[in-house]
Amino acid sequence: MLILFCADIEIRLIILKSRGYFCSVEEKKLPYKVIGGKPTRIEYSADDVFAKIKQEEIKFIDLQFTSLPGRFHHTTISANTFTPDQMEDGLPKLDGSSIVGFTSIDDSDLILKPDPNSFAIIPWIASKKSARMLCDIYRGAGRGRLETDPRGICQKAEEYLKTQGYDESFWGPEVEFFVFDKIHWDVL
């Protein structure tokens, strides 16, 4: 569930910080706050995002998305070149033929459309302050949403569940990683 996923990341980052791996983590920088022990989503409009970029002196923005096999991808842009039109219309920053399950080489121009509600400052990049937004993926030339965009698939499934009488559902990945104190391996 997405809510638990984000709260879990926050807890893990605090643990890693206590072990000296990362800079400090401020709860307000993540897209969820924990209020009364319950994760609560922070919602942003496009105007809120641009105000936050200016207020927090963000230098770079990671435009993030996933492929069908579940691999997390991103492309980074300079925050000072990011415009409200790009937030509204998307950015032609993706060659779909290079992402497994997206498109063929002859139809590869895709558009990343940032979701302002997914805006979050990346707390472990302190020197060149960065933020991220998850993106929806569209075909170029106004041809609509990419059918194999995992976010789009989840959104369609969520809408279908609503038509079946379910009020609420939670969707999202679970990020897994390991931190080792020591690693040893033999090389032939």
Residue ranges and their predicted role:
Residues 20-188:
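ATP/Mg2+-dependent ligation/transfer catalytic cores
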